[in-house]
């Protein structure tokens, strides 16, 4: 009797696909840190990292070696267990958020019927990591940064979820494959433009990226909630932020820009090209926009994004009811 039954082979193939996809996501997040510095140098008329390797190509390797050998320091009077757990939760929750994204018709870590709800759950779990880091560090700047981050993230997650409800109502499913298949003729960005706009803004805010990086503002909070972190613990926070950018970019592509669909090229290539475009847009936003005050960020969310999201949802519901008659 052979152990390698068809069912076992299918399970092994699924596990292999999941490992490959998640490793690619981590690699993309790591390489984006180097690409961002090079692009920012280009935008600001300077060189950027160009000393290690040809044209700075080994800068990422040098950063990893440096981070690996730095002292793994824990501050006095801190809660060691929670201090250590926070970066692990941050990294894991952001990485698992990508699990529901189909990169091709047959490649996805998990094909869940509640795919969008799973993403919102993982995004909410990342808030606990920020709170744990701020509280366990026993540092006033860390705590202030954590309070800012949690309030901002929870506020913009409201708009993040509501902006997706128009797509869900239009398609009639929370499943990501169903959403991609529904865009065979028309991308969702056309009927759901305001949903796309609010989702993109909320995605930048949830990732704590410029101009919504008040929780980590160096001029005000000396790097915010991860001021006390060093070594690999800081590395998990650092790479996790870029994994969040990759995940939000992939979700924008999947939900509003047809996912892996496109002519001539293989599906995975289309998905990668579209995702790379929005990753570059994250960097361009950082290079071109100033940082507003924290109260302006919160007011913009509740006074602009929320009404826009609700109007989009009401308009979508009205169109669906009209077409059903």
Curated annotation (Swiss-Prot):
The chain crosses the membrane at residues 11-31, 81-101, 114-134, 154-174, 186-206, 237-257, 265-285, 304-324. GO terms for molecular function: NADH dehydrogenase activity; oxidoreductase activity, acting on NAD(P)H, quinone or similar compound as acceptor; quinone binding. Keywords: Cell inner membrane, Cell membrane, Membrane, NAD, Quinone, Translocase, Transmembrane, Transmembrane helix, Ubiquinone. This is NADH-quinone oxidoreductase subunit H. It catalyses: a quinone + NADH + 5 H(+)(in) = a quinol + NAD(+) + 4 H(+)(out). InterPro entries: NADH_UbQ_OxRdtase_su1/FPO, NADH_UbQ_OxRdtase_su1_CS. The keyword Methyltransferase does not apply. GO terms for cellular component: plasma membrane. HAMAP family: NDH1_NuoH.
